[in-house]
């Protein structure tokens, strides 16, 4: 996972998991509303009366209808990342 997405992914995942309604503002000013069904590196699948695939490069702002507790997700991601680095370091030391 790219370092720049270490906040983005857990935040979007918390919005998706908790089914929090969001307003997504595009760079051209259009406001989309719905729930985040899924997302990947390039797009967000927004569910409302229809599903919309929104390209991330077109998004200016994501505004949740209520606050989201993504801190646990970020901490968990950091712990997993740290554990992965420790495993890699151990593997390197064993091959030397």
Swiss-Prot record:
MF terms in GO: RNA binding
RNA-binding listed as a keyword: yes
Sm domain span: 9-68
Gene Ontology biological process terms from the UniProt entry: regulation of DNA-templated transcription; regulation of RNA stability; regulation of translation, ncRNA-mediated
Iron is among the record's keywords: no
Subunit: Homohexamer.
Function: RNA chaperone that binds small regulatory RNA (sRNAs) and mRNAs to facilitate mRNA translational regulation in response to envelope stress, environmental stress and changes in metabolite concentrations. Also binds with high specificity to tRNAs.
HAMAP family according to UniProt: Hfq (MF_00436)
Protein family: Belongs to the Hfq family.
Name of the protein in its database record: RNA-binding protein Hfq
